[in-house]
């Protein structure tokens, strides 16, 4: 028995569905200098009227404080109702992600789950979400998108000012979370 190098570890951290599924979004994280695609999955329970109990927030593989902040920004800045609803968020394959560049993908996955609308299967999302609902620049956007394109992704949402062009890839720059949701046709109530 021998140990072999895995040339493309992305398959460990993403899953391919026959049809797009609500509540999933792919991002590109950096492990050192190496870009890795990772899928974030979210599940949002149906709202309950007159439920005075605390909503559950269950997080696996993501920073729970960043997740809580992103949920608050979704509610208050992008009008996606998650208060009073249980929210579950996880990374595929047990990957641990703490970098802010995954915020936008998390927000899109949760909004997609809350609305029951799937995101395009060939979309990646990269960007930090600020408390005012702004999408902030992150490092290594060009390297991240080159890897996503190499693995078959044709569309990307990135922060305004990223100034990245890749032939064959539609790259949309967004400055605000509500604008990002509109670009993927998931809007608040």
Per-region residue spans from a language model:
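Peripheral, non-AAA+ core regions of ATP-driven protein-machinery
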Residues: 4-189
